[in-house]
Design a protein with these regions (language model features):
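Short, structured segments at the rim of ligand-binding sites
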Residues: 1-386
């Protein structure tokens, strides 16, 4: 049973995907109940992952444990994001996987069994490749060892995956950048309470930084399980006062100061922090950003481009973003580039800008935070949706 599951486009794609693999799922108001299966099965239709990268990567890996061919598809936009390292890893572990690209998008064909062995993946492209293989590895014929080559970025998300697997009775050994999963193993049922989503809440925190009003956000704990709660440690340095009361946070703005932040483990914090940096006194630097080119849009280009329309001065080079703060932003016609986090960052910046802004393709927020604009309205923001 899962309590507090997020309902958005991405999680809906995952839900439909696991149902196609044979799981029985009941979705209720506050909880989701799933009856598992010993091994993924096939369906007569392709699993449509839409634009959900996590769904595509996780279910591609899990499908490698099926004894029948599983078909997965995704949008053309998602097809441009990395998948080949995962496909190669699945083949190296004895299963069969190949991807076919055309004008409509991408189709992936996967068939097990996953025989086991050792595979190496670069750790600086997507941690979801490693998480996906960890989900599949217990169903392999023999032990699986996954080695992360180079720096493993977004390591906290791999740890989160391991914690979930351990709750389901799966044994995993980690040493010197290697993850060894004895196989075969059997999953046991477990219950989960999903912590609040700091990746989304960070945009409300950014809104506080741009306009200065105090806000309270509830339902965010326990913080130690959410990697993007790292923004709480940075907040005092930026000039945001944070008071914690159980699972609630109250955020108030003081004088904003320029800051430095390493986003290697928290790439989703870059858009809200980039927005805050525009209003801070002095310059700010965000490092560890090279993977932003692989997101829903190339965020190394798209967000600086949109904020520049408002008067922001942002420079992206190599693995760093530099933001010149203390600049007055002016409302403008902006575009989300169909990227949910760019849309929310533009909205947060617009709150502190002089004049009105229009955000085209703002519906992109439904990918992760469908009620974002409703929540802004509850906070007193004047907005209209056309």
């Amino acid at each position: 049973m899962i309590q507090g599951a997020l309902h958005c486009d991405d999680t809906q794609r995952t839900l439909e995907g696991i149902q196609s693999l044979g799981a029985k799922v009941q979705v209720k108001k506050t909880r989701t109940i799933s009856s598992g299966i010993r091994r993924p099965t096939t369906s007569n239709r392709s699993i449509d992952c839409g634009e959900s990268g996590a769904t595509l990567r996780f279910l591609t890996a899990i499908s490698s444990a099926s004894l029948k061919t599983i078909r997965l598809s995704c949008s053309r936009r998602l097809a441009n994001r990395p998948l080949e390292p995962l496909v190669k890893a699945i083949n190296s572990l004895g299963a069969s996987a190949h991807a076919i690209s055309d004008a409509r998008g991408l189709e992936v064909l996967v068939k097990g069994p996953l025989r086991g062995g050792e595979v190496t993946l670069w750790g600086d492209i997507s941690s979801q490749f490693i998480s996906g293989l960890l989900f599949a590895a217990p169903l392999a014929i023999r032990d699986v060892t996954i080695k992360a080559e180079g720096a493993l970025e977004s390591r906290p998300y791999v740890k989160m995956s391991i914690d979930v697997l351990k709750k389901h009775g799966i044994s995993i050994e980690e040493s010197n950048g290697k993850f060894r999963v004895p196989a075969p193993q059997e999953f046991v049922p477990a219950s989960h309470k999903v912590p609040g989503d700091f990746s989304s809440a960070a945009f409300l925190i950014a809104a506080t930084g741009t306009v200065g009003d105090e806000i309270t956000i509830s339902g965010l704990g326990p913080y130690e399980f959410e990697p993007d709660s790292a923004i709480l440690k940075l907040a005092p340095e930026i000039g945001l006062e944070v008071q914690q009361n159980g699972n609630s946070l109250t955020i108030a703005k003081r004088e904003l100061d320029g800051f430095q932040f390493d986003a290697s483990n928290n790439p989703d914090l870059v858009p809200p922090l980039e927005t805050i940096g525009c209003f801070a006194d002095g310059s700010s630097e965000i490092r560890g950003v090279k993977r932003l080119v692989y997101k829903e849009s190339n965020r190394l280009q798209t967000l600086p481009t949109e904020l520049a329309k408002m008067g922001a001065k942002i420079h992206a080079e190599d693995d760093m973003i530099k933001i010149e703060g203390s600049r007055e932003l002016v409302g403008s016609a902006l575009d989300s580039h169909d990227d949910h986090r760019v849309a929310m960052a533009c909205a947060a910046a617009s709150l502190g800008a002089r004049g009105e802004s229009i955000i085209h393709n703002s519906e992109a927020v439904s990918k992760s935070y469908p009620k974002f604009f409703q929540d802004l309205a509850r906070l007193g923001v004047q907005l209209s949706v056309e």
